[in-house]
A protein has these predicted regions:
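Histidine-acidic metal/acid-base catalytic patches
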Residues: 1-5, 10, 19-30, 105-107, ...
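N-terminal pre-domain/capping segments
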Residues: 1-107, 118, 124, 142, ...
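Active-site-proximal loop/turn and secondary-structure-junction residues that shape catalytic pockets
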Residues: 12-14, 41-43, 77-79, 113-117, ...
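Active-site acidic/histidine proton-transfer and metal-coordination neighborhood
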Residues: 20, 66, 83-229
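Short beta-strand segments at enzyme active-site cores
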Residues: 38-39, 72-75, 107-113, 166-169, ...
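Short secondary-structure transition/capping segments
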Residues: 49-51, 84-86, 121-123, 179-181, ...
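Alpha-helix-loop-beta-strand connector modules within alpha/beta enzyme cores
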Residues: 56-73, 147-159, 223, 295-303
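Short, basic/glycine-rich phosphate-binding loops at helix/coil junctions
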Residues: 71, 128-132, 280-285
């Protein structure tokens, strides 16, 4: 068997609801030789207050139909089934995302793994019942993970009727939130101490299970649906492996039976801090840079060698600033896939 093809992401911030920009980008992607394009449901304004926007969806479909391309869909980056404050809205957004994927003939729908947002804990409704620098306890996090599993199982049935597979994407570390979490834990355990370093510790990635591939695998296993798998984002996993201290290549092997979609891009394995501006991060080699492969340090020869037998889409997820290098990036990806026996 062979891969379905090589794709590229349509950038949500670049499109920002402007379908003329989408049209221009699709024309560019087709000229470059891509087979698939990943459409961000939030970038094309397909959902309005948790419901499909039929007027806009009609216009989107008219644009997509002009091109000899196939499509996958990315849910809103904001979508989070572990957000207790806004759960009904997140669920309805997810249902609308499935409907959108079905409308445009996409078989794959990417969803970022859920997380307990620390800013919600301190600034949202939950903050009214929490002490300063208290932590959401393990029971609360476990309950939100359980609800996400049950909801994904329910949504999987809805998606199956429409020919859609849900692919849960692994996360990269959010160092600013990790530091807040760890500081709160240490204050509770040790009291105020200004001389210890903030670093991953006791409750490592508790609030954000998708950063740990082993926990993501367990979550997807727990859903127990054939059409719920993993989007393995190699860039995210490479950063997370350095930050959390797990073996990057071993994590691919662990997730391999559940991988139904992949995101391919490069970085240096160093997490960003609070300042996530690309103009700052690029020169420092930090953060989720979304560069073409070969620009960073991810060992893609070893990565692709572990994808033999993979039958999905290989999706390049690049920042718009790398547009001049699209054809080069596509050719390099094809070459390396072929050398590794993944074609």
């Amino acid at each position: 068997m062979s891969i379905k093809g090589i794709g590229i992401n349509a950038d949500s911030s670049r499109i920002d609801g402007n379908l003329e920009v989408l049209r221009e980008d699709l024309a560019c992607f087709q000229r470059a030789g891509f087979d698939y394009v990943e459409i961000p449901v939030h970038g094309v304004d397909a959902i309005l207050n948790g419901r499909l926007n039929p007027r806009q969806v009609k216009r989107v479909k008219e644009v997509l139909a002009r091109f000899d391309l196939q499509y996958t869909v990315h849910c809103s980056d904001w979508l989070n089934l572990m957000d207790a404050d806004e759960f009904p809205l997140h669920k309805s957004n997810f249902e609308a995302s499935i409907e959108f994927a079905s409308e445009i003939g996409a078989k794959i729908l990417v969803y970022h793994s859920g997380r307990v947002e620390l800013e919600n804990e301190y600034l949202g409704q939950a903050a009214l019942t929490r002490e300063l620098l208290s932590l959401p306890d393990r029971a609360l996090v476990s309950e939100q993970e359980r609800r996400e599993r049950e909801t994904l199982a329910e949504l999987a049935d809805f998606a199956k009727e429409r020919g859609v597979t849900i692919c849960v994407e692994n996360a990269d570390p959010r160092v600013d939130e990790e530091a807040l979490w760890e500081l709160a834990r240490r204050v509770r355990v040790k009291g105020i101490d200004l001389f210890y370093r903030i670093a991953p510790g006791g409750d490592i990635a508790l609030y954000n299970y998708g950063g740990m591939i082993s926990r993501l695998v367990e979550q997807v296993k727990g859903v127990g649906k054939e059409n719920v798998g993993i989007t393995f984002d190699f860039g995210h996993a490479y950063i997370a492996s350095h930050y959390y201290g797990f073996d990057f290549l071993d994590s691919i092997e662990l997730a391999r039976p559940f991988i139904k979609h992949v995101h391919v891009h490069d970085d240096f394995g160093r997490p960003a801090g609070v300042d996530r501006r690309q103009i700052v991060l690029i020169s420092q080699g930090k953060g989720d840079l979304h560069m073409p492969i070969g620009w960073g340090e991810i060992p893609y020869r070893e990565v692709f060698s572990r994808l033999k037998g993979y039958e999905g889409v290989v999706l390049l997820e690049l920042k718009p600033r790398y547009r001049p290098y699209l054809e080069e990036a596509l050719q390099e990806t094809r070459r390396l896939l072929a050398e590794c026996g993944v074609e």
